[in-house]
Structures are given as structure tokens and as C-alpha cells.
Amino acid sequence: MYGGAYLTPSLGPLFFSTMGTKRKATKPAVDFTKTKQKLGKGKQAASNATDTSFRAKAIAMPQQSILLDRSHQVTTRRRQTLSDLVQHTHHPSPGVRKDAVMGMLELVKTYAGFLELHCAALINAALPLLGDDDVHVRGAVATYFGVLLDRLDDEAFAPFAPSMLLLTTSAMSHISMAVRIDALRVLSLLLDKVPALATEDWESALDAHSGSDRHGQRLLQAFFAMLGVAADAHRQRLGLSTASTASVELGTSQRLRILRALGQFLSVTDQEEHGMWCFQSAFASPSDLEHFEGLFQPSKACALWTVAAMPSASSYEIHEALVHGATSQEAPASAHERLVRILHPSLLSTLLDALPSVMSPDGHRSDAHAELAQHILQVYLLLWRRTITSHLAAGAAQGTTRVAVPSLPQLSQLLTHLAPYFAEKSEMLHLHVIYCELVALYTVATQKAHHLSSVPFLLDLLSEPSLSPALYEALLPTFWLVVSSPMDGHTDVMAALLTHFDTLRDRTLQAAAFRFLARLAMLPTYKSLQANIDALYTPLWNTWILSLPRVLWQAATWAVSSKASPAEARDAQRLVEDVLTFLRWIALMPRHPFFDHAHVLNELAPRLTPLFHVEHPQRGPIPGPYHKWPVATQHLAQALTKLVSSP
């Protein structure tokens, strides 16, 4: 070892320190570091420096000015004027647009006379929102227009009706099915408000050669597009097949709303009374039929001539009908017949899909499918009723009751599919009534006895006191079909009708039943009658005739009662006149095949006495309701008393 180093022969000298290790010098901590600036760069700001610069921009806030005096303006609860709300209807936010519509509705409901003063602004501001993309805005618009159209009279709304119909039709043709469906709510309002304008020239939608462009045509074409069916005009232009094909997938609720609106549209186009259509084939003389249908109708003043287009007939078709009318018994197809040809495939397929859920054997019923089936059958009934009656009228004009209905196989196909579902009684009473009338239409058109298992069904209905007036009138064609057809139980139905009359307490139903039975009693007086009325002969006619003075007394006292509304008083007074007229006709006849004429006249006299005066045991003679009748009714009663024994 030499001086702290060891010498080894192989590794050489190995150095190591024999003293302690030397400490490294530590630098003091620095609070801030100074960044070295680069050449040509400015001084950088500190990391904790506060930016005190600002930028200003001018904005316009005319609707939120605190300096604006609105103490004398009509405002909403949010202090918004009509001008503010009109501007907000164009706002990009759906919520603001909806609030604007509801704000205008608030102004209309709050301030009397505001609608009449600002009618144009209130309507025109909301019209563009009929086809809005937001569902809540469309719902608010429908509610808004429902209030406006209810409060506006027809004269005030007339200038805005065409624009509203155009925009409603545009919304019904929107690319979104949701917008189309919601537009039907507004269409329903317009059909109630301006029915004639909304359905104007609707038949042109079925004619490919028509150059018309009216609201009714556009609306019906919109319905065709929504249902996915092709109209005659479209098929002729595009060369499509005659079978309708559905190209639009619709849910149950959507199809229900479309068919409900379509039914309302078609019912508006058909405002004629069709309760007596079933008697058209019972008369060989058109004059007798016209007189029979006019029985018990209220007197009408002379109607003014109106200019209207001839529906569904071009000049060429009229010429062909005039040339070949004398040799052909087949009337030209009406607009309703062509329409039922177009809608039949789509309606039938939808109906067959819905009926199993309605007429389920286990008793479970889908309310949505039940309503859907009801609206489909109502559309069918309306179209087939107009189709059959138009052919019967054409046959009566030619002096024959045998007419050819080209589209009748479609009705036969419909009844074939419906028969299994209506073979037994069910809770769907209104569907059974429609089915019965469809069967009556087919039977009258074909003049062939159709198997109708409705006699027990009708007897059950007539034994129930809950029969409504509308249901009773809908059953009139079925009643006539049964009593005029040689089938088992037809005499029982006639007896049930006469017995059912004595149990009626509803005044409207009592009036409808009287007019129907009185018409049946007048049938033997027509020479051109060609219907089988053997079932009408029953001893119960005597009882029914002698019960009419009681009906006359009830109606007469109600007509002058202070509890009756003006409409109820008018209806009761009309029933009084109808009963007096019928009894006078009966008294004028030398004999009647239905009852003992002499016996009835002798029994009527004492039963009519209370109408003139009543002997009270304490107060003595009291004047009857006769003294409060109009002069014309008093003269009618006097004429009746001269034909029977003096009261």
C-alpha cells in the first residue's frame, strides 16, 4: 500500500477515499423565475394579470323597453300586446310560437269585443302555423281556431274561409303524416262552419277530364293521398290498374282519425233526408211516392233558385243518357257509386282487420278498433244509401222498380264478410243497426229475399225502453223490410211496433214512431202500391188509433207549457198538427182495411173532449189547450170535430 492505494498485480491500482465524502453545495430557493425575453418580442403579461378590456355592441330591444308606456294598451298577463304576440308567431323557438298563440287566445277570452276589432290580425297571424313542425304548436293552433270560429258569425268569417281552407289542404298534403293528421282537427271546424264551401264541387276529384279546382276537390284528393288509394282521375292519368293499392302505412289511431274526418266530409255532402228511402220501391207511380214522402213534413216557403253545378255529369254523359235512356234501365254511375268503388278495397281490408278485435268471442273488446269499425260502416252506409236510392229514383223516372246496379257485387261481398260477425246478438248495438240497413239496401236493390235473422233482435229492441230516437229512425228501413217480406215473425214485429208505441215517454221518439206508424196506416190508400202489406193487418191498430188523443193532449199541454224550451215547444206543436191531420184523414175515409172505422170514430169523440174543456169537480169547466193554439191549428181541430160526434 502506498499512500492509500493498493497495488495488485492484475487489476492495477484501486483508489478509494479513506477520508469522509465531501458535501455538495445547495442553491437557495427562488421565488420568481425571470423569463428570458426573445429578441423582437414584446413584454409578456404576467400569468396572474387581469384583463380589463371590454367590447361593446349595439342591440335593439323594442319589446323590452322599460320606457314604453303600456298602461292604456290591451295586454296579457305577461304584459304582451297583440303586436308583440304577432311578432312572436315567427320566432324560431316552438315554445315561443305556442305561447304567442295562447297569448292571443287569452286576449280573445279576456276582452269583450277584441275579436271583432282585430279579427284580421288574429286569424292571419295563426294561419301559417297550421302546418307547423312542432306538435304542441299545432295543438295550440287547433284549440285557438276552435274558439275563434265558435265566436265569429258566418258573415265575419267569410273573407277568411278560402285562405284557411287552402292552408288546411296544404297541411293535409304535408310530407309528415303527423302534420296531416293534426290538420284534420281544423278541417272538422271548417266543415261545421262553412260546409258548402268546404265540399264545393267535390265530385270533380273523381273525373279525370274536369278542369275544376275547388276546395271540395282538393280536400277529397288529400283524403285519397292519406288513405293511399287511387282515384279514377289518377288511374286514368297514370294508367294504373283499377284495383286500389295502399301505399301508406297507418296506425289504428291515425286511420281512425282519417276515417272519422272522411265520414264527416261525406255527411256534409249528403244533407238530404233518407229516412223514407226504403219506400221508393213500394210505389209504381212517382207522384204517389212524392206525396207519401211529403206526409207530415213541415210546410216550406218558396225556395229561392240557386245556381249549382250538375254533379258528376259531363255534357257528353248527359247526351248519352238522353239518347239511350229510353232503352236502358241502367242509370249512369253517380259520384257516390264511383267513390265506393275506389274506397271499397281499402275500407274492407281495414274492417276485416278490426272486426276480430271488436266481436271477440271471449268478450274482450278493443275500443279503438270498435270505433274504427263503426266509422267504416258509417261511410259504407252513407255511400251505399246514396248509390241505391239514386238508382231507384232513376228507375222510378222510367216507370220501373227493377234497376241494375253495377257495383252491387261489392255490397254483396261486404255483407258476406259481415254475416258471421252479426249472426248473434252482441253489445255493439249500433253496428248491428248499420248492418241491418245495409241488408235492407241490398234486398231492395236486388228484389230478392235475403236471409235476415234480425227478427229476434228487433223484438228484443222493441221490448227495451232505452231505445233512442236516432236508433229508432235508423231501424225504420229494417222494420219496413221485415213487415213487407214474407218471412217468419214479420207479423210479430208489426204487433211489437204498435205495442211499443204505448210505452214511449221520450217526446222525440214518440213523434218519430207516430209518423212512421201513421205512414204505414196510409199505405192502403195509394193505388200504385205494389208492396206486400199482409203483415200490417192486426187488431192492435184499433188500440193504437184510440191512443192518439192521449198523445195529442200530452203534446198540446207541453207546447204551451212554460217549462218547454222554444225548440221543444215548436216540436210539440208540430206533433199536434200532425196528429190532427192524420185523424182528419182517417175520419174522411169511408172505411179502412186495418181497423173498424165506425167503432174508431165513435170512440174518438169523447177522447177529444179534454182538448176543448175539462170538467173540474170543484172549479167547474176549465178551458183546454185548444184555446192557446194558433188559429190554423184551431181550424184543423174544428174540421176534425165536424167529422166525428160533437164533443
Per-segment meaning from a language model:
Residues 75-86, 114-129, 156-171, 196-229, ...:
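HEAT/HEAT-like alpha-solenoid repeats
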Residues 92-94, 133-135, 175-176, 231, ...:
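Short inter-helical turns and helix N-cap capping residues of alpha-solenoid HEAT/ARM repeat scaffolds
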Residues 57-72, 101-113, 142-154, 191-210, ...:
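Boundary/linker elements of alpha-helical solenoid repeat scaffolds
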Residues 124, 131, 135-136, 141-278, ...:
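Fungal eukaryote-biased detector of long internal structured cores
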Residues 89, 100-111, 129-130, 141-152, ...:
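Hydrophobic residues within the alpha-helices of tandem HEAT/HEAT-like
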Residues 344, 348, 352-647:
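Long alpha-helical repeat scaffolds
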Residues 15-75, 231-241, 245-417, 421:
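Acidic, serine/threonine- and proline-enriched intrinsically disordered linkers and terminal tails
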Residues 52-127, 131-159, 331-354, 358, ...:
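Alpha-solenoid helical repeat scaffolds
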